[in-house]
């Protein structure tokens, strides 16, 4: 019995059929079920094992160093389609099973995505490029810079749209960073998946198809494309600075905050319905792109909670941090016991910015005395900027301006991160 055999395993009260997988535990047999999920079975509880020939089977082979090479893609350009570059950074959308551990790890290059989703070739001329291969929780500011540099290079080489595959956990941080760092006339679309490609419930293919569709549109700016509903119906196009992951596992985890999505994308009919005004591109400047790579990394993001110790702020100040973003309660408040830490930061020229942990809504520190006193201590209320976006924005500002100018610019709407008014519906 070898890895890759299709087997029927009888236990005392049940039976399992599936593909035999490698196991790192000598006492356990691992089987990949038809559902796409793995099950581990203790050998001592197995009554019998029978090798079967699966329906429509081909000889299964796990990826190894000797068989994971593919022949180069031979793609002919269609002059009627736009040229789209897919840049892979890793994550669930670009993952497959690790047959050593049974876990899912990043493994696909961008070209592998084309092989997995051949429908892309009916939408655009695709160029694939892997720039990173990381889980998104390992994303670093220096990787934002690498991504921005890759975007610039692709646009200068003729890309008319960019798709970036990215893990979902920190995708909204990267979307915000690229929004501030990259100035371009082409759409830059980030896309991820909540369920990996080996699972029947995977959202990867529909999300990628929808992302490439969006990348062919005559719009500019940075966006996120993900499932718009739990079912495989539509995907939503979100502004990169007004979107957040709001569920740990649902396929429609990403939502626009304080506004509607920019558009709904139907990957089946290939229709895009815009829900509000877009940022039209200037096609005569399609190859013009500039990036600003300067970021101040000594920025902290702190969630306010009952009993929070002001020593936390003093710690960051003493460690040389340049700015601190607070996720305040409600309209932008902190406990009074936190005031001494804020005062300490202000006296040491450390900028303290206020967002709200409610996510939806706007900071307003003029209503209650707590907010007014915080302002007197130097805290700047930052409208309806999402805390993660505010964190990235001040990194960008302090990387390019002194403290005085950064204070003036923090509440200036630069790339759509501030809504002048909020529809009560959202």
From Swiss-Prot:
Keywords: ATP-binding, Ligase, Nucleotide-binding, Protein biosynthesis. GO terms for biological process: amino acid metabolic process; regulation of translational fidelity; translation. Its EC number is 6.3.5.-. GO terms for molecular function: asparaginase activity; ATP binding; glutaminyl-tRNA synthase (glutamine-hydrolyzing) activity. Residues 82-413 form the Asparaginase/glutaminase domain. SUPFAM superfamilies: GatD N-terminal domain-like, Glutaminase/Asparaginase. InterPro entries: AsnA_fam, Asp/glu_Ase-like_sf, Asparaginase/glutaminase-like, Asparaginase/glutaminase_AS1, Asparaginase/glutaminase_AS2, Asparaginase_C, GatD, GatD_N. Belongs to the asparaginase 1 family. GatD subfamily. PANTHER family: 60 KDA LYSOPHOSPHOLIPASE, L-ASPARAGINASE. HAMAP family: GatD. This is Glutamyl-tRNA(Gln) amidotransferase subunit D. The lineage of its organism: Archaea, Methanobacteriati, Methanobacteriota, Methanomada group, Methanococci. The gene is gatD.
């Amino acid at each position: 019995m070898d890895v890759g055999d299709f087997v029927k395993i009888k236990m005392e009260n049940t039976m399992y059929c599936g593909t035999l997988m490698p196991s790192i535990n000598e006492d356990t047999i691992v089987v990949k079920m038809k559902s796409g999920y793995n099950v581990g079975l203790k050998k001592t509880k197995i009554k019998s094992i029978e090798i079967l020939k699966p329906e429509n089977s081909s000889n299964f082979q796990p990826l190894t160093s000797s068989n994971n090479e593919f022949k180069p893609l031979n793609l002919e350009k269609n002059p009627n389609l736009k040229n789209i570059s897919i840049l892979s950074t890793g994550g669930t959308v670009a993952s497959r099973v690790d047959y050593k551990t049974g876990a899912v790890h990043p493994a696909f290059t961008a070209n592998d995505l084309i092989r997995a989703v051949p429908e892309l070739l009916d939408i655009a001329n695709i160029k694939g490029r892997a720039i990173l291969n990381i889980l998104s929780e390992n994303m670093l500011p220096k990787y934002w810079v690498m991504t921005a540099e890759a975007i610039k290079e692709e646009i200068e080489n003729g890309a008319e749209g960019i798709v970036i595959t990215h893990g979902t956990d920190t995708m909204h941080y990267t979307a915000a960073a690229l929004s501030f760092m990259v100035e371009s006339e082409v759409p830059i679309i980030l896309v991820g998946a909540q369920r990996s490609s080996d699972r029947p419930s995977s959202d990867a293919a529909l999300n990628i198809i929808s992302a490439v569709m969006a990348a062919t549109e005559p719009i500019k700016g940075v966006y996120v494309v993900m499932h718009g509903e739990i079912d495989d119906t539509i995907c939503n196009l979100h502004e990169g600075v007004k979107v957040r992951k709001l569920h740990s596992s649902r396929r429609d985890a990403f939502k626009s905050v304080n506004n509607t999505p920019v558009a709904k994308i139907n990957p089946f009919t290939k229709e895009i319905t815009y829900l509000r005004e877009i940022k039209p591109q200037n096609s005569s400047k399609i190859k013009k792109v500039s990036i600003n790579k300067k970021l101040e990394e000594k920025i902290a993001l702190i969630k306010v909670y009952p009993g929070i110790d002001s020593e936390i702020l003093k710690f960051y100040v003493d460690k040389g941090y340049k700015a601190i973003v607070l996720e305040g309660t409600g309209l932008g408040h902190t406990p009074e016991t936190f005031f001494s830490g804020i005062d300490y930061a202000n006296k040491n020229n450390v900028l303290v910015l206020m967002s709200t942990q409610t996510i939806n809504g706007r900071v307003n520190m003029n209503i209650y005395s707590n907010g007014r006193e915080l302002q007197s201590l130097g805290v700047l209320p930052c409208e309806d900027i999402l805390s993660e976006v505010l964190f990235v924005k001040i990194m960008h500002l302090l990387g390019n301006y002194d403290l005085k100018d950064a204070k003036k610019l923090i509440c200036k709407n630069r790339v759509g991160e501030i809504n002048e008014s909020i529809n009560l519906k959202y």
